[in-house]
């Protein structure tokens, strides 16, 4: 209150906001800052910084993969030995770093996340009944967190309609013998303007552990590169937010317009004693394909070169890992395509040279990347606002199965393989965004992947617009079904019928499968 009285006294009526000199005398600025900094506590010991986290606490962990994770604070939780934690995280990283450390020490009861990635330990604990796993679409997770921070108890979203997210029944906990103990609950559904939406509730936490780049001595925080991700919304959504940073600077170092998290959201700050900043998938421009990689497979290259024809000048597009990302290598230099990454980048560039590698700049596949001139970074809640709001013209992704009416399944094989839906459910939920699937026509065991009805849990219902395989290209009509529009020269219509487990029409203008030319 003393600070407010000073402000009221020192700001005369009618003073222009554009006056070049400060509104307060320097001595009053110093006094105001001194008064304000008392509400943000600074620590030197990570264990003391997480004081109050107890058995059964709900803890949000910022970061995406290994980028922007609060590694010192996670280590402090390990040291404290608190158990039965409910962890909210975008994904679970790797076995021996970040959240994986807490999983290995059996300190976590439940994980709420969107993607397991390559964390084999988490998948093993889950399938063995030692860990509860609440899989949530990444954009929905970001919005549930953001909603809590803004005082909104619930909201409606189109993401997940027609899937296990809406219907319930997604496995949360298995028994050691493999039978299901806990399943997800169905969502309330409501229709708005002819579309169906799910009711999702805000998610709160006792603590949020955040990784920033720098903080000033009043608690304002800034980030580097794509490390904003889930850190920004999480910092606003917990009862107590603890931010570890690489550097603490004097007040006034940051221009007011450059501050990413105002100190009103910050309770505790610590300068991390050390940072490993491990990179999950180090990828450089001159990286060679790993042994056994399919990158040079002729069939795969055929899909890539066909997929590249879907890009248009001025387009905003999101590309899944694998074939979709590789298709971007064939974008004509005469064309500008703005590539979006769910973790908070618009304007993805090529993979970096070895001397350009930056642990704070990764894509949604956790690969090191660069950003083109004019590109930008933002938090995960903003990223999915772009996606859900229909601001992308194209999303291209892989699939395990696609139905004849455009249903998509690509995130789970019940009881066997659990990777998570990541941002895929959000990406296919906007009616304004064209969805292109790139995949091999059949499985490794020669089973068709294009079916009358998907047998695996759906990612989206009637959402796919085009299917590209090494054999053919299908256009998808969500009410009439598939039409074969292009055919690879080594295939025949009879061959496609034999390897496709549903009926389809053949275009009267059927043509050879198109391929982008390198000089295009």
UniProtKB/Swiss-Prot annotation:
Tissue/organ expression: Testis specific. Expressed in late spermatids. Accumulates during spermiogenesis. Also detected in the midpiece of spermatozoa.
GO biological process, one term: generation of precursor metabolites and energy
Keywords in alphabetical order: Mitochondrion, Transferase, Transit peptide
Pathway of action: Ketone metabolism; succinyl-CoA degradation; acetoacetyl-CoA from succinyl-CoA: step 1/1
Active site: 342
Residues of the transit peptide: 1-39
Residues that span the membrane, as ranges: none
GO cellular component: mitochondrion; motile cilium
GO MF annotation terms: succinyl-CoA:3-oxo-acid CoA-transferase activity
EC number from the UniProt entry: 2.8.3.5
Main enzyme class: transferase
Ranges where the record places region Disordered: 280-299
Chief location of this protein within or outside the cell: mitochondrion
One Pfam family hit: CoA_trans
Localisation: Mitochondrion
Catalytic reaction list: a 3-oxo acid + succinyl-CoA = a 3-oxoacyl-CoA + succinate
Coiled-coil intervals, chain numbering: none
Family from the record: Belongs to the 3-oxoacid CoA-transferase family.
Assembly with partners or alone: Homodimer.
Protein function: Key enzyme for ketone body catabolism. Transfers the CoA moiety from succinate to acetoacetate. Formation of the enzyme-CoA intermediate proceeds via an unstable anhydride species formed between the carboxylate groups of the enzyme and substrate. Probably play and important roles in the energy metabolism of spermatozoa.
PANTHER family: KETOACID-COENZYME A TRANSFERASE, SUCCINYL-COA:3-KETOACID COENZYME A TRANSFERASE 2, MITOCHONDRIAL
Protein name (record): Succinyl-CoA:3-ketoacid coenzyme A transferase 2B, mitochondrial
Provenance organism: Mus musculus (Mouse)
Gene name per UniProt: Oxct2b
């Amino acid at each position: 209150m003393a600070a407010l009285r000073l402000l009221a006294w020192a700001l005369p009526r009618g003073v222009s906001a554009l006056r070049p000199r400060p509104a307060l005398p320097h001595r009053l600025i110093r006094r105001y800052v001194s008064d304000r900094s008392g509400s943000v506590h600074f620590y030197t010991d990570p264990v003391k910084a997480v004081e109050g986290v107890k058995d059964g606490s709900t803890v949000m962990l910022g970061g995406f993969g290994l980028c922007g994770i609060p590694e010192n604070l996670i280590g402090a939780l390990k040291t404290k030995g608190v158990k039965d934690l409910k962890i909210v995280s975008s994904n679970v990283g790797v076995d021996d770093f970040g959240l994986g450390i807490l999983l290995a020490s059996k300190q976590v009861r439940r994980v709420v996340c969107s993607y397991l990635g390559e964390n084999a330990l988490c998948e093993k604990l889950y399938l063995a009944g030692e860990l509860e796993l609440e899989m949530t679409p990444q954009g929905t997770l970001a919005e549930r967190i953001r909603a809590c921070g803004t005082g909104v108890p619930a909201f409606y979203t189109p993401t997940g309609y027609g899937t296990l997210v809406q219907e319930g029944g997604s496995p949360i906990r298995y028994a050691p013998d493999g039978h299901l103990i806990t399943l997800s609950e169905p969502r309330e559904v409501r229709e708005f303007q002819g579309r169906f939406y799910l009711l999702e509730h805000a998610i709160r936490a006792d603590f949020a552990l955040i990784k920033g780049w720098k903080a000033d001595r009043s608690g304002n925080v800034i980030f580097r590169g794509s490390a904003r991700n889930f850190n920004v919304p999480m910092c606003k959504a917990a009862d107590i937010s603890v931010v570890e940073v690489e550097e603490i600077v004097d007040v006034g170092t940051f221009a007011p317009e450059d501050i990413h998290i105002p100190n009103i959201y910050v309770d505790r700050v610590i300068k991390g004693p050390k940072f490993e900043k491990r990179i999950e998938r180090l990828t450089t421009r001159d990286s060679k394909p790993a042994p056994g990689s399919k990158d040079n497979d002729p069939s795969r290259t055929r899909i890539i070169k066909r997929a590249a024809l879907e890009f248009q000048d001025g387009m905003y597009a999101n590309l899944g890992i694998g074939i979709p990302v590789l298709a971007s290598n064939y974008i004509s230099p005469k064309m500008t395509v703005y590539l979006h990454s769910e973790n908070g980048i618009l304007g993805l560039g090529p993979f970096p040279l070895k001397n350009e590698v930056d642990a704070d700049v990764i894509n949604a596949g956790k690969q090191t990347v660069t950003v083109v001139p004019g590109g930008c970074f933002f938090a995960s809640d903003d990223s999915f606002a772009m996606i859900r709001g229909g601001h992308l013209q194209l999303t291209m992704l892989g699939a395990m199965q696609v139905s004849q009416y455009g249903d998509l399944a690509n995130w789970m094989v019940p009881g066997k393989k659990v990777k998570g839906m990541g941002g895929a459910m959000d990406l296919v939920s906007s009616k304004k965004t064209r969805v292109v699937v790139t995949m091999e026509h059949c499985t490794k065991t020669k089973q068709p992947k294009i079916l009358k009805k998907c047998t695996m849990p759906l990612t989206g219902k009637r959402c796919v617009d085009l299917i590209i395989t090494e054999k053919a290209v299908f256009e998808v009509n969500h009410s009439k079904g598939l039409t074969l529009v292009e055919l690879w020269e080594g295939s025949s219509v009879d061959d496609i019928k034999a390897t496709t487990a549903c009926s389809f029409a053949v275009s009267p203008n059927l043509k050879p499968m198109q391929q982008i030319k390198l000089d295009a």
